[in-house]
């Protein structure tokens, strides 16, 4: 059995900064979305993805991959959004077993109402606090990590 490669001081500082910042930012985002529209962050991300998709619709499997959710977690979120009238399900014309999530007009209006406040929070606590160079470095580092995580599944 190999000994674990413990984190040195620099690595530990980076890890702790990432974890605490992620949780604090996520909390601010959740507070803003809940106050503005009663949405959770995952629900908001679903609305964003659907708004950008052709005809405001996506296959559930593709949507789960995009929002990094398990199929059961996505199904739960879609059910909540459906109850709120923001999303509906439709059968996939090219695959009878496939299910599409479709953004409703009410869902689009909700997104248009909530998005400015969401961007404000993201800017205030992350984007506007970093230089362009820091943003590029962060993007490069996070994409490397994301690729490793996605390819290990």
Name each model-derived stretch.
Residues 1-9, 132-153:
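C-terminal regulatory/oligomerization modules of transcriptional regulators
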Residues 23, 27-70:
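N-terminal helix-turn-helix DNA-binding core of bacterial DNA-binding proteins
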Residues 60, 78-79:
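Short, hydrophobic-biased segments on the C-terminal half of alpha helices
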Residues 79-137:
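Charged, amphipathic alpha-helical coiled-coil/dimerization segments
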